[in-house]
Amino acid sequence: MKRIAALFLALVMALSLVACGGSSNSGGSSSGGSSNQLTINIWDSNQQKGLQQIADEWSKTSGVSAKIEVVDWDNYWTLLEAGASGGEMPDVFWTHSNTVQLYMDNDVLLKLNDYIANDPAIDLSNYYEGIVNLYTRSDGNVYALPKDHDTIALLYNKALFDQYGVAYPTSDWTWDDMYEAAKTITEGSNGDVYGMAMNTSNNQDGWYNLVYDYGAEIINDAHNGTTIGSAEGKAGMEMVRKLLTVGAPQSVVAETGTDSLFMSAKTAMITQGSWMINAFYTAEHHDDYAWALLPYADVNGNGKCDSGERYSAYNGLGWAASAATKNPDAAYSLISYFCSKEGQLRQSELGVTMGGMKGVSEAFANAFPGMDVSPFIEAESYDLFFRPYTRKTTVWEDALQQTGGFLDPWQNPSDAALMATACDNAQKIIENAIAAE
């Protein structure tokens, strides 16, 4: 138990502040549950209402109540660390690529193999392969079922584009087109409005996508190397640098946040994940907002988007249960319902998120009347990469955000040499972190 506690303390201290799941409310206790009640923890308040509705539908047939509690991202992991050290854990909860490798290695999660083998509702071949692989240990043991998947799109403010005479983004946009549009808006407003904003600590919905568009990888498919320091990686990061020169300074982003800047009409464009749609759909000025495909990198120089030039990151949360839950059968039954075709379709229909099961997300595009969210679905007709991870993802992710990583070019984007040097440093940071795992 001391070994587990030490591992999880190190993990929590290293955790990134980036979460795949937007706003959250603080608070929410958890308990070990009882034979007729399950406690569920998540970190995204945007999803609570829809997921509780699905859980209530399960409760009507199971006779077991299930209460969803929202815990903010930081406290979420502190809570689970305490549970792993001998305290109480929620019965059912979300897992994430940042942390799940250590959870699986330390017997904190309920092993699901026997349940899956006897469950006609679950066939792992029906889910996105990257998500299944994430929650399957190297010995074949499965510790979570795919809850959802997400993609990234470009969000823009039509009113600001109109005000500054800039044409709306289209599927033909390159990253250079985005740069020129952002530059026009920033300069046209004398800096009162930023053409774009990127939170550089939010890698999944931001700069990771450009690295892949230009032909490099943050982590390779074998999870044992990177090409961030290659010519292709440097080209992608050079484009990131250019965008930052016409966007909101990172000091402003750190203070206000890209979402708040956008909702207050202080920036005209951001890139954002599908898990955040509802926050913008319910915002005061949502009629001004529209989504578009992420731009592409015209690496081949032929004026069209070729294979490998437009990527979207995708990730997927997993539904897991505590190995110490007092009612493992009910916990799995609930997870199975969430992840069954019925539950996955309900999740899409209610606009919670797109499904972790393939072929169930079309209804998601119709869940937001008056707002076209089809770019998130359309992104899958191009290229996807699974959110990069290794056994100790947060070690190198954290280091990339520090001095010696990308901190200097983030803060001083006008200096191209700083970015090139940071890419070389990043290559070493990731390689050394993997070697130490």
Task: Give the predicted meaning of each segment.
Residues 4-6, 17-108, 117-124, 168, ...:
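Conserved N-terminal structural module of periplasmic/extracytoplasmic solute-binding proteins
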Residues 91-94, 268-272, 290:
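Paired acidic/hydrophobic, glycine-rich loop segments that form the ligand-binding mouth/hinge
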Residues 82-83, 90-91, 121-160, 303-312, ...:
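A structural signal for short loop-to-beta-strand junctions that line the ligand-binding cleft
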Residues 97-151, 290-293, 368-369:
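Hinge/lid segment of periplasmic solute-binding proteins
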Residues 56, 60-61, 164, 242-248, ...:
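Extracytoplasmic/periplasmic substrate-recognition and gating elements
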Residues 181-184, 222-252:
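Glycine-centered hinge/linker elements that transmit conformational signals in sensory
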Residues 77-89, 160-161, 179-184, 256-270, ...:
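Short helices/loops that flank or line small-molecule/ion binding pockets
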Residues 304-305, 349-405, 437:
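Long, aromatic- and glycine/proline-rich binding clefts that accommodate carbohydrate-like moieties
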